Curated annotation (Swiss-Prot):
It comes from the Bacteria. CDD domains: KOW_RPL26. The keyword RNA-binding applies. The gene is rplX. Residues 85-104 are annotated as: Disordered. PROSITE patterns: RIBOSOMAL_L24. This is Large ribosomal subunit protein uL24. Part of the 50S ribosomal subunit.
Length: 104
């Protein structure tokens, strides 16, 4: 899985929502997509009685998905790329910016 986790703030770098930022709500690794809060909104037509949340049915707006390749993780206000680094032991490991330190 690329260096993206649920709860990360990401920036869309390609597509109709290019340049916008949001928080990752859900990862779909088998499809290579992410769902981002309040971005890529799609409308779904819900039949009456299908769900407890909408017993009357109607048209529901919810977040669509974006390809993982079209988003970058933000640290502070800057997008960052992850890199492979060599540790002292010589093992390669995927690395990303330490979000926990910069978030405080």
């Amino acid at each position: 899985m690329p260096g993206i986790r649920k709860g990360d703030t990401v920036k869309i770098i390609s597509g109709k929502e290019k340049g916008k930022q949001g928080k990752v709500l859900e990862l779909l690794p088998e499809k290579g997509r992410v769902r981002i809060e309040k971005l890529m909104l799609v409308k779904r037509h819900q039949k009456k009685g299908r769900s407890q949340a909408t017993p009357e049915g109607g048209i529901i707006e919810k977040e669509g998905t974006v390809a993982i390749s079209n988003v970058m993780v933000l640290v502070g206000d800057k997008p960052v790329r992850r890199e492979k680094i060599k540790r002292e032991l010589g093992a390669k490991e995927k690395a990303r910016a330490d979000r926990r330190k910069t978030a405080k």
